[in-house]
Amino acid sequence: MTTILRIDSSIKGEAAVSRRLTQRILDRLLEAHPDATVVSRDLAQGIRQIDGPWLGSVFTAPEQRTADQQEIARTAGAVMAEVKEADILVIALPVYNFGAPAQLKSWVDHIARRGESFVYTETGPVGLLTGKRAIVAFTSDGTPLGSELDHASGWLRQVLGFVGITDVDFVAADRMVFGADEAMARAEAAVAALAA
């Protein structure tokens, strides 16, 4: 059975264009995988930013963790498990000031962990999350996908590839202030063309 992990990250909640787009992508995937399990995480509802206590918790042996460290490690482990168990990731990438939202960066910090999602070898790093697909819903008011102003999509593609997820597609509703209807029409066409 297919497991789809949906990651929303906009602070606009239900009003977010990226959320509408992740829902359309999810609907398209469910047409092809009607029995899929869908796991959803809304990062705007809160995800811990990594800090000293987080680092100390996830890299301390389980039997040596304090009660506080056990709770932090449990939450961090749940975020990692969602990604490991997913076959397909649907990720909202709304662009804020030319980059990714802070909460999406925090999620990436949770999943890019040595020994969990990648290892270092004599020839360099090797991603461990292979065999997965990611579909990214890229939205922006004025930043074109892939332009020199876009510091979000290349970063996310790089991070996903680093952990082993190299099958990455982008669906863009970009430059919304220059024609929201046209941008959404292009995005809808891209969703319809997705190989589910």
Swiss-Prot record:
InterPro entries in UniProt: Flavodoxin_fold (IPR003680), Flavoprotein-like_sf (IPR029039), FMN-dep_NADH:Q_OxRdtase_AzoR1 (IPR050104), NADH:quinone_OxRdtase_FMN_depd (IPR023048)
Name of the protein in question: FMN-dependent NADH:quinone oxidoreductase
Keyword Cell membrane found: no
EC number assigned by the record: 1.6.5.-, 1.7.1.17
Disulfides per UniProt: none
Any one GO molecular-function label of the UniProt entry: oxidoreductase activity, acting on NAD(P)H, quinone or similar compound as acceptor
Cofactor(s) essential for the protein: FMN
Gene symbol of the encoding locus: azoR
Protein keywords: Flavoprotein, FMN, NAD, Oxidoreductase
Family of this protein: Belongs to the azoreductase type 1 family.
Cofactor note: Binds 1 FMN per subunit.
UniProt cross-references to SUPFAM superfamilies, sorted A to Z: Flavoproteins
Function statement: Quinone reductase that provides resistance to thiol-specific stress caused by electrophilic quinones. Also exhibits azoreductase activity. Catalyzes the reductive cleavage of the azo bond in aromatic azo compounds to the corresponding amines.
Catalytic activity field: 2 a quinone + NADH + H(+) = 2 a 1,4-benzosemiquinone + NAD(+); N,N-dimethyl-1,4-phenylenediamine + anthranilate + 2 NAD(+) = 2-(4-dimethylaminophenyl)diazenylbenzoate + 2 NADH + 2 H(+)
Subunit structure, interactors included: Homodimer.
Species in which this protein is naturally found: Cereibacter sphaeroides (strain ATCC 17023 / DSM 158 / JCM 6121 / CCUG 31486 / LMG 2827 / NBRC 12203 / NCIMB 8253 / ATH 2.4.1.) (Rhodobacter sphaeroides)
Residues reported in the UniProt entry to bind FMN: 10
